[in-house]
UniProtKB/Swiss-Prot annotation:
Organism: Streptomyces sp. (strain KO-3988)
Lineage: Bacteria, Bacillati, Actinomycetota, Actinomycetes, Kitasatosporales
UniProt GO molecular function: ent-pimara-9(11),15-diene synthase activity
Entry's pH dependence statement: Optimum pH is 7.0.
Manner of cofactor binding, per the entry note: Activity is highest with Mg(2+). Can also use Co(2+), Zn(2+) and Ni(2+).
Keywords: Antibiotic biosynthesis, Lyase
Protein's name in the database: Ent-pimara-9(11),15-diene synthase
Length: 295
């Protein structure tokens, strides 16, 4: 337990250093939650190994979400931003035109030096693009919902569950792995992580619905033709699917499978008690912490 705490503190210090370079976009990022999560999912890894595995600050899923929700005003602007993100990820292009893009450029450059990255680059580019398509869907659906015209089919929503960014935030653990047999297990890991992505999306939606229902431009599964019971059933179904795929590898002592099971357990458990927002350095000190009283 003490070792995990030390790792979390080292990761937190690293994230704070990175956030200080881009205060325009990262000052409201809940970096404490990200540091704790990173250490909890991979407690046997050292802080140096996890430096690339805390990309919520670096490549921007959390700050990118914020920027898109708060600052993007047109679909053309959104498509331009996402196109530049893809150019960085797929082509290695450096882009300093915006702090988010500069941060992503630096992180991508470091990621490309990871041992398994060359063989995983194509998969990384495809899954990153899939996450951006999910973000785009959420943005357009939220805009339509503000006009009273939002989509209602929950299965359509789940098609874009990559907007949870669970896949792209976990990927660095594969790229930096020292396991020579990682690629042998990759098909199972990839399929399981896609199921986990849906579970994370649903558990996040359950945690954030009360906040998001009062905010413009939001898109949440509970805004569709669903109920909390339906969402919990789908969450359980996708969790079981991932567990059934991963259990044989985890039982055999394959660390990448264990990490995915820990990612699933940590995410669902955390979101069952709290929204990631509002209990760390991003907390509004004039209001309640948002942290569950038993944590």
């Amino acid at each position: 337990m003490r070792a995990r705490h030390r790792v979390a503190l080292k990761v937190l210090a690293d994230l704070r250093s990175w956030a200080a370079e881009y205060p325009q976009v990262l000052e409201a990022t809940p970096i404490e939650a990200l540091a704790i999560s990173t250490a909890a999912i991979s407690p046997w890894r050292g802080a140096n190994e996890l430096r690339l595995s805390a990309p919520d600050v670096r490549c921007g899923p959390t700050p990118l979400d914020d920027h898109v929700e708060q600052n993007v005003r047109s679909l053309d602007e959104l498509d331009d931003l996402f196109g530049r993100c893809e150019a960085i990820v797929r082509g290695g292009d450096r882009d300093d035109g915006h702090p988010l893009l500069a941060s992503l450029s630096g992180w991508q450059s470091a990621l490309e030096r990871a041992p398994h990255y060359p063989k995983l680059a194509g998969l990384w580019g495809d899954r990153f693009a899939e996450a951006l398509r999910g973000e785009r869907y959420d943005w357009t659906a939220g805009l339509a919902r503000d006009r009273g015209e939002g989509p209602s089919d929950p299965q359509e929503y789940l098609t874009y569950a990559a907007s949870s960014n669970a896949w792209i935030t976990h990927f660095p653990r594969w790229a930096t792995s020292d396991r020579d047999d990682l690629l042998d297990g990759l098909p199972v890991l990839d399929n399981a992580l896609e199921a986990i992505e849906v579970a994370v999306r649903l558990s996040n939606d359950l945690a954030t619905f009360e906040r998001e229902r009062a905010e413009p431009g939001q898109n949440n599964i509970l805004m569709y033709d669903t109920s909390p019971d339906w969402v919990h059933d789908e969450l359980d179904r996708h969790s079981r699917k991932a567990q059934e795929q991963l259990d044989p590898l985890a039982t055999a002592g394959f660390p990448p499978a264990v990490e995915l099971l820990r990612l699933l357990d940590w995410s669902v458990t955390f979101y069952s008690g709290a929204d990631f927002r509002g209990w760390g350095s991003d907390r509004d000190l004039t209001g309640p912490s948002g942290l569950p009283s038993d944590m």
